[in-house]
Amino acid sequence: MFADFSAAAMELGEVLGLQGLTVPSTKEGDLSLIKRAAAGSFTQAAAASYPSPFLDEQKMLRFAKAAHTLPSGLDFGRENEQRFLLSRTKRPFTPSQWMELEHQALIYKYLNAKAPIPSSLLISISKSFRSSANRMSWRPLYQGFPNADSDPEPGRCRRTDGKKWRCSKEAMADHKYCERHINRNRHRSRKPVENQSRKTVKETPCAGSLPSSVGQGSFKKAKVNEMKPRSISYWTDSLNRTMANKEKGNKAAEENNGPLLNLTNQQPTLSLFSQLKQQNKPEKFNTAGDSESISSNTMLKPWESSNQQNNKSIPFTKMHDRGCLQSVLQNFSLPKDEKMEFQKSKDSNVMTVPSTFYSSPEDPRVSCHAPNMAQMQEDSISSSWEMPQGGPLGEILTNSKNPDDSIMKPEARPYGWLLNLEDHAM
């Protein structure tokens, strides 16, 4: 019977790593043998209650002898010693602690044997270390950045809402955020200067053509002041030259076309404006003894048939016409206070030209309407019309066959736009 017991003790020693355990002889004390056998049986029962894959398959753990030896001086036969032994050997570790301990023991075996450690064993340790670092709010010292914030997903955009949401896009190179969120918190400066220069370049070609609502607003008035069309200056110079040539030229042509010359010379056109510019005085041009006088027969006859019903006062509330006329006068550098209007006197059939341009609500007057610049350009710059010798007055003088047509149709002449009357205003 004792031989069977010694054989069982040797088997327990082989399982638990007690290879150095020798079976004592019968002459030795039986108490020490019983204690060792009891300790081996209890450790085997504890290992059976918590199985481990490493212990069963590879049998790598061989430290059960030092871990579960009984304290010295304890008697195994009493009940309190049995309870103490069960409490110490039943649950020494939790299952997770036991597996981690076996894992570390396996790595130690590789180190002791001077063999390369598999990467699968090391990856599990790094994962456990990261989870413990995030849980304990430790800094990731293993990355080499002691003060860097822990980022579980490096390379991902770090834009968050502060709670749960995080951007799913990848961060740019050497940046924390993606292309969408990299400039989110930057204060935007003013618009670049290039855009402003492009706007001015786009606006400058528009200044050559006057809109229909010229004079409404300071910006549009500034455009009118800056605009200096070459056609108007050319016509003024040519008309002044023709006036000088007319005084020295043929008197026979003047006698034949006397009423026509009076009409063309004394229109409120650029020649009258040039005379006002030389005198620098607002004057009233009456027809008493002046050679530049105009009679109502020569001035108003062409329009009496067509504008007899419309020869009434223009409403004072038409600020549009006033602004248009003021913008046209500024191009001829007239003073601001100089105004001009055409008034038909009741006593004498004389057309006076006072120094005011604006119509008053009291007296029936004929106002000068602002020109349409697009129409003026079409009249002055046409492909089929060539500049005659002597200017527009020379054209009228040479075209002496049909003087009635030129009188009855003032709009056909290049300066007909300056005498647009009530039919254009309405």
From Swiss-Prot:
Descriptive protein name: Growth-regulating factor 9
Entry GO MF terms: ATP binding
UniProt biased composition (Basic and acidic residues): 191-202
Location(s), subcellular: Nucleus
GO cellular component: nucleus
Motif Bipartite nuclear localization signal, residue range(s) on this chain: 156-166, 184-191
Segments forming domain QLQ: 92-127
Lineage of producing organism: Eukaryota, Viridiplantae, Streptophyta, Embryophyta, Tracheophyta
